[in-house]
Amino acid sequence: MGRKVRVGIDTGGTFTDIVAVDESSGEVVSTKTPSTPSDPSEGFMTGVAKVLDHMGIASGDLTTVSHGTTVATNALLQGDYAGLGFITTEGFRHVLEIARQSVPEGYGNSYFWVKPERIVPLHLVREVSERLDAEGRVVRPFDEAAAVRVARWFRDRGINAVGVCFINSYVNPDHERRMRDVLRAEHVECAVSISSDVLREYREYERSVTTLVDAFVKPKVSDYIAGIKSKLDDFAATNGDGGVPFYVMKSNGGVMSAAEIGEQPITTILSGPAAGVLGAARVAQVGDFDPVLTLDAGGTSTDVSVVRKSEPTMTTEGAVGRWPVKVPMVDVVTVGTGGGSIAWVATDGGLKVGPRSAGAD
C-alpha cells in the first residue's frame, strides 16, 4: 500500500516554497525552487516533483495539494493595468477620478503630493444610459443599443477585461447582468466582472475599484489555476481517480476548490500572505506568544499582520497597495517592496524602491 502525502505550495513572484507531509509517519520535508513568472505553473510542478523526489515517493501517493499564491497580489502591486476598462452609469464617468479625499499619511496638505494614476484612466471609462433609485426601482431603462456600442468599442481597442458598476446595482442587479450578457455576446474574449456579484454593498468608489480588481486578476488567476490543475492531473494520473484534489487558499484563511476560483478570483488576492499569517498564528499558539507581529518578506512584496490570542486579525476594509479591496480577508498590510525590488528615481528626484521587481527571471 502506498504512502499518503499532502503537499502545500506557496508561489511568490521570485520563489516557490514547497512542504510535504506524510500522513502516516508525520515526516515533513520542505524545499524551494525559483518561480517562473512567464508560466508560474512550471515552477509549481517543478516544486511538486522536487519535494516528492526528496521523500522518495511516487506521484500516485499524493492525496491533496493546497496552494497559496501571490500571482494576483503581485500583478496588482506592480501596477500594469493595460487592457482594463470600466463601464458605469451615464453621468458618473468620473467616479474613479473623484475617489476619496484622503492622502497618504505624512503628506497632509503638502503641495508636492501627486495623486496616483487611476486603476482605469478616464479615456477607458464608458457610460451607459440607465438608472435605478435607492430602492432598486428603474428610473431610466437600460439602453441596450448603447450597451452594444460600448461593448464593441472595447472589443475594437483590444480591452479584454472590463468591470461594470452601475449606481444602486447592489439593490437590483438586473441592469448589470444585462450589460454582462451584452459583453459576452459582442466581445467573447472579454473577462467581465459586475459589482453586484463581487461586492453587493453601497459606496460607489470602493465597489467600483473592488470590481475592477476582480476583472483585472480574473484572466490571470483563471489561466494560472487551470494550467496547474491540468498539469497536476497529468502528473498524478497514476492515482487512477482522475487526478488529485487541488485547493487554493483564500484571503480569509479558508480554501476553495480550483473549479470555483475562476468565478471568484478576487478571493485569492491575499492568498499567499493569508497562509503565512495562519502559519505564524500556529507558531504563536505553540510558543504561547501574544500578541505577535508577523512579517513575510518575499522577493516582490512584503506583508505585515498582527496575531492576537493565536488568531489572525480579520477585516472587510482591506487594501492591496493603494487600492481598496472590500472582501473578507486576513488583515494584512501589503507593500510592493521585496528582496528583488528595483530602485528608480522619481520625477521629483527622490529615490524609490519598487513596486517593480526583478522577479525570478
Model segments located where?
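N-terminally biased helix-coil "hinge/interface" segments that flank
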Residues: M1-D361
